[in-house]
Amino acid sequence: MIRTGMLALGLLFALPAQAAEQRVYLVATMQLDGSSLAQSVFLHEPDITDLDGCREAVREGQRARDWQKYHHIFRSDRFKGFSGHMQYRCALSELEFSMWRDGPRYNRSYLIGVDEDEMLSAQRTPSQAQCMAQLRALSPSQQAQSLCAMSNQDLTP
């Protein structure tokens, strides 16, 4: 009896101490109108722990035009002669991204998806062209939930 209990206890400790933690992300995407060109940032605020909190922070940021949470800057001065629009999407993910810093090097291509359960997926692709090929290979319903975008953040292991 004691052996069985010890074995069960040993197996319990052999399991990972904790499943990967789901983080709440704000995926902010600037899409250049009339094209497939987009830039995305993956923003995480440790004190926002649910999707409703994320959506409220987006409403407040858009209303006040002062992002107290998920602080970011849309550099419209870099897009003179072009029009674009911002899309904000709150999502959950076990992925971890490096911190976003405003900078010129949006040179990492990602296939990004947010499914009907608001789960974020992001897959690094070698190029924007290869990302578009992967996007076109998805089912129509998956295509509607996905996009290709450039980012200056890395996925961290």
Functional labels for PLM-detected ranges:
Residues 14-17:
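N-terminal signal peptide c-region/cleavage motif recognized by signal peptidases
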Residues 20-157:
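Mitochondrial intermembrane space
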